[in-house]
Amino acid sequence: MKVIVSADDTGSAKEVICNEGTDTSKQNATQPISIDNCLLEPSSSVKSRIIHFLSFNYQYLIGARLGGQVSVYELSDEESEEKFKLLHNFELPVDAQDKPVALLRVEILDSILVAFESSKVFLIHINDSFDFKPLELVLPEYKPISAFAINPQAENIVALGGKEHDLQILQLFNKNINSTVFKKNNYENEFKPQIIFKAKNVRNDHLELRVPIWITNILFAKAAKGYKLVTSTRYGQIRLYDTAEGRKPRKDYKVTEKPIVTLTFANDEQTEIIVTDTHSLIAKYSLTQVDEKAFKTISASAGEIVKPVPKLLGKFTGGNTGATFGVHAYERIVAFAGLDRYLRVFDLESREILAKVYLGVEVSALLILDDEDTEDEETKKRKRKEEEDDEELWNQLDTKKKTHTI
């Protein structure tokens, strides 16, 4: 397995190569094949640490950094002399403390979107010469955002939200546009974001008080009509939206008392999600099965209040403590890392822990580059020696056969 993780303490990253069964907390267990520092350029500083990773066409590794830098690295093979060579560094005009909330690929445009907390959004066309000037998309409203997502079914559609900024869906450009648009002289005119949906808040609580809004994550789900979305909040809620049914959430569930940090689909059917919070929760929930009386709270005025929640399918346990910020589900595995400085890799279906590696740094982002086990150098040398011995044996047999023939 090969995973790259951000190193928040230094502003660089680490490449971890390990196999199933790796556990650095046990002296007699399998140890990582390698843990190498990388992405040291353009500068290694906590003030420009990497917040998001993206693999672009399996050709480039892109990192969105605090303060507006977007670094593009070469995704080279293991035998390359210089791994993750810096190819280009875009510098976006944002404040030094402005944090990227999303780094997304727009396949139909051969481009990426970078969204910041300040509500600034940039479109960058990725070509071989990296000579495209980032285009700032002027949003209809400028409110701070905490979440930004693209619709995989229609990449001209995005959704955003944040603190007291309820869910909005926007159209960034016409659906018929593709990457040839950048050949036009005034291509900027093709990108005029428009709000096409504004959500309404849930009804007041049992005390008739307004429920506060603070969206932390957004996922687009598959939809035959309109748009379906899943959101998480700073108040531990999971909400399901269907624009074909109205502006309010179709379902509103409380799954934790802590702020939800990440939200990830756990299967291709999009019927399961993985949630992490600021404490130690890493859990898988069903979106189709509901426990009607799973969440209980006591109110001085209303007594015991019972609410339904998505069925808990199980937790990913491996001694994790503190918030988990880096999450990536890929093929059969899922990887986690965060404040406790450990990388943990699990089987996505069974939740069995496959690898546990101490990193020595806090992590904001990670990306699985390969989910298969990797041979270490000793194994490679042994196999090469066996192949050479086999070849020598066949050569000897071939020589004897020719001698007998003569």
Curated annotation (Swiss-Prot):
Subcellular location as annotated: Nucleus, Nucleolus
GO biological process per UniProt: ribosomal large subunit biogenesis; rRNA processing
Highest taxon listed in the record's lineage: Eukaryota
Matching Gene3D superfamilies: YVTN repeat-like/Quinoprotein amine dehydrogenase
Gene Ontology annotations for the cellular component aspect, listed alphabetically: nucleolus; preribosome, large subunit precursor
Annotated keywords: Nucleus, Ribosome biogenesis, rRNA processing
Spans annotated as Disordered: 373-406
Chief location of this protein within or outside the cell: nucleus
Subunit and partners: Component of the pre-66S ribosomal particle.
Family per record: Belongs to the NSA1 family.
Job of this protein: Involved in the biogenesis of the 60S ribosomal subunit.
Record-given protein name: Ribosome biogenesis protein NSA1
Organism classification: Eukaryota, Fungi, Dikarya, Ascomycota, Saccharomycotina
Gene name in the database record: NSA1
